[in-house]
Amino acid sequence: MKISKEFQNGFLIFLGIAIYFLLMNLLGLSDVFYLRLFNTLFVLYGVNRSIMMNIHDGEVFLVNNAKSAMKTSLIGVFLSIIGLIVFSYLQGGDQYVQSLSKTFLFGGNPSVMTYSICLLFEGIASTVVVTMLLLLYWNNRLVTD
């Protein structure tokens, strides 16, 4: 059974984000908000890799590449959120999330699920932004007259 390129690249996004956050946690930098923004690089890499694989396979239609890019990014986001939920409960559940949320845009004391749902919406929004940016980039590269 062949695994789809979207799942392969979505899993690469998940692995990159997971290793990055585990490394930040081990180094004691998990509370530095600005370092968390670098996870966008892993999403950009995975989505760009899917689009490049499509182009290599001869798929140059914008809509098909958009679907592939969105699937790739959403798989990475969903796997990352599931990993965050598991990791949060292993680290103490709500108490761990409350230590993270001190530097995040939450009011009050969010639970693991509240935190995860908010990050899910943020991830879906970033999926749309990353997909559109890369599609515009590749569309300009592939235009032939």
Sequence positions of predicted segments:
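Hydrophobic alpha-helical transmembrane segments
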Residues: 7-15, 38, 66, 70, 109-130, ...
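Cytoplasmic juxtamembrane interface segments
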Residues: 44-71
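Hydrophobic alpha-helical membrane-insertion segments
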Residues: 69-87
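Transmembrane alpha-helical insertion/packing segments
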Residues: 1-54
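Juxtamembrane non-transmembrane "cap" segments at the membrane-aqueous interface
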Residues: 82-102
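Cytoplasmic juxtamembrane regions at transmembrane-helix boundaries
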Residues: 136-145
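Short, membrane-exposed interhelical loops at transmembrane-helix boundaries
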Residues: 96-114
